[in-house]
Structure formats: structure tokens, C-alpha cells
Amino acid sequence: MSKKAPAQKEKKLPRAATWYELDLEKGVFRFKNKLCPKCGSVMAFHKEPVPRWHCGKCGYTQFQR
């Protein structure tokens, strides 16, 4: 019996429009997410179990009030 090769998935790259906000009046791009104060990487927002911002690179966490 012949084995089938696994189907290759297309990689979907994130669009820059999802990362930035554009202010047309001022002509300025602004980053939507927070940057880590320790290492400068982009922080991710998590809703469960407690709302918080977390840096995956250095482990820094800011809890929401």
C-alpha cells in the first residue's frame, strides 16, 4: 500500500493592519499592543483566568485592575 504525503498548510502571515493603528489626521502609525518594559518585546493580552499582559520572552506580567 502506498502512503500519502501529509497535506501542506499555507502559512498565514499576520497583517500589519492588525498590529498598528493609523491616525489619518496626524499621519501617524501607533502600535496597538504594549511593549515590555524589561526587554522591549511585544506583550500579549490574556483574558483567562485573570486579565493580564504577559511577555513571552522574559516572563514579565502586568495584571489588570
From Swiss-Prot:
Organism superkingdom: Archaea
Any GO molecular function: structural constituent of ribosome
Binding positions for Zn(2+) per the UniProt entry: C36, C39, C55, C58
SUPFAM superfamilies the UniProt entry points to: Zn-binding ribosomal proteins (SSF57829)
Zn-finger region bounds: C4-type: 36-58
Gene Ontology biological-process entries: translation
Cofactor binding note from Swiss-Prot or TrEMBL: Binds 1 zinc ion per subunit.
Cofactor names: Zn(2+)
One family name in Pfam for this protein: Ribosomal_S27
GO CC term (a single one): ribosome
Keyword Phosphoprotein on entry: no
This protein's UniProt keywords: Metal-binding, Ribonucleoprotein, Ribosomal protein, Zinc, Zinc-finger
Matching NCBIfam families: PRK00432.1
The family this protein is said to belong to: Belongs to the eukaryotic ribosomal protein eS31 family.
Quaternary state and interactors: Part of the 30S ribosomal subunit.
Protein name: Small ribosomal subunit protein eS31
Organism annotation: Pyrobaculum aerophilum (strain ATCC 51768 / DSM 7523 / JCM 9630 / CIP 104966 / NBRC 100827 / IM2)
Gene that encodes it: rps27ae
